[in-house]
Structure formats: structure tokens, C-alpha cells
């Protein structure tokens, strides 16, 4: 018999045998996923083909947001991706793809102090393969080779955001350590 529940997470007693066995198991269910906003701009088609050699440089920016929904145990998570490509030789824009992708999740059994990181790491991680496919399809349909995004480290992204917020709250005259 397996120590995993339907969501693939190990049962609490398997994770920490010394913990209280009465702690509820984590339950995560994707209720729906959707494109909230999508934009693709092909600068090459608008301005004409660039002269000389084209060496694309691609940058990807990711931001996340989560909020509680009125229904019990339901949360909406929005991941925003901005994929911008420019010519490395003259910095002229090639394309811009912006995607806001959302999901509504049913989450139970996550302690309150761990809920925010859970929503900002695990939920976007589950949605990422769909985001990656949409961006790949959009770049291909926009007249460019398909762009397959590298996996995003949502743990590192979360830590960076927490560090940024902590830094923003620190008074300007207070030393860093």
C-alpha cells in the first residue's frame, strides 16, 4: 500500500512520523485553469524585416498573485508571464508575448502559516506546463520558432519576492545586518 493520497503528497505520518497523526492530509485540487489575458505583438511584421543578422535575445519576467475566493477553501492564483525578444545586435524588438494565466484551486489541510508559500509555489508549478505550451504556440503562430520556456524555480521566485518586501519595509538608515 502506498503512503500517498490522491494529490500525490505523502501522508502526514509518512512525512514526519513523530507528528500528531490527527493532522489532516493536504488536499489540492485544480478546479479550473484559464487565460485571463493574452497579447502577442510581432514587431518584425509591423516594421519590416531587420537588416543584417538577427540574433534573438529573450527575457522572461514572471510575477504571481493569489487571493482567497468567497467559497470555502478556494483560492485564485494568477501567474503573469512577459516574454520579450529583441535582436542582440541592434536591440530592436522582435516580439512581445504577455500572458496572465489563472487557476482556481481547492486547498485543504495546509497550516495557515504555510498557505501563502503553498499557493505561490505549488499552484504555479502545477499550471506551468500549460503556460509553457501557450507561449510556445503563440510564438510559433506569431511567425517565430516556438519558444519553449525553461522551467521556472518558483521557490527561488518566492524567496526573492519575500526578500524584496522585507527590504522595502526596512527604513533607509537601518543597516542590512
Swiss-Prot record:
It comes from the Bacteria. Pfam families: SecB. Keywords: Chaperone, Cytoplasm, Protein transport, Translocation, Transport. The keyword Translocase does not apply. SUPFAM superfamilies: SecB-like. One of its GO terms (molecular function) is unfolded protein binding. GO terms for biological process: protein folding; protein tetramerization; protein transport. It is found in: Cytoplasm. GO terms for cellular component: cytoplasm. Residues 8-22 have a biased composition (Low complexity). Residues 1-22 are annotated as: Disordered. The keyword Cytoplasm applies. One of the proteins required for the normal export of preproteins out of the cell cytoplasm. It is a molecular chaperone that binds to a subset of precursor proteins, maintaining them in a translocation-competent state. It also specifically binds to its receptor SecA. HAMAP family: SecB. Belongs to the SecB family. Homotetramer, a dimer of dimers. One homotetramer interacts with 1 SecA dimer. This is Protein-export protein SecB.
Amino acid at each position: 500500500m502506498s503512503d500517498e493520497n490522491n494529490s500525490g503528497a505523502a501522508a502526514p505520518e509518512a512525512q514526519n512520523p513523530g507528528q500528531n497523526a490527527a493532522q489532516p492530509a493536504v488536499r489540492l485540487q485544480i478546479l479550473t485553469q484559464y487565460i485571463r489575458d493574452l497579447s502577442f505583438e510581432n514587431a518584425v511584421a509591423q516594421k519590416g524585416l531587420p537588416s543584417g543578422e538577427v540574433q534573438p535575445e529573450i527575457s522572461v519576467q514572471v510575477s504571481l498573485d493569489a487571493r482567497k475566493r468567497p467559497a470555502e477553501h478556494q483560492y485564485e492564483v494568477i501567474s503573469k508571464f512577459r516574454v520579450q525578444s529583441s535582436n542582440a545586435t541592434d536591440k530592436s524588438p522582435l516580439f512581445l508575448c504577455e500572458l496572465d494565466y489563472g487557476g482556481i484551486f481547492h486547498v485543504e489541510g495546509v497550516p495557515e502559516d504555510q498557505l501563502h508559500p503553498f499557493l505561490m509555489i505549488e499552484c504555479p508549478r502545477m499550471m506551468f506546463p500549460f503556460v509553457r505550451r501557450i507561449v510556445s504556440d503563440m510564438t510559433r503562430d506569431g511567425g517565430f520558432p516556438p519558444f519553449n520556456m525553461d522551467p521556472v524555480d518558483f521557490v527561488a521566485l518566492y524567496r526573492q519576492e519575500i526578500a524584496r518586501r522585507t527590504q522595502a519595509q526596512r527604513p533607509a538608515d537601518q543597516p542590512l545586518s
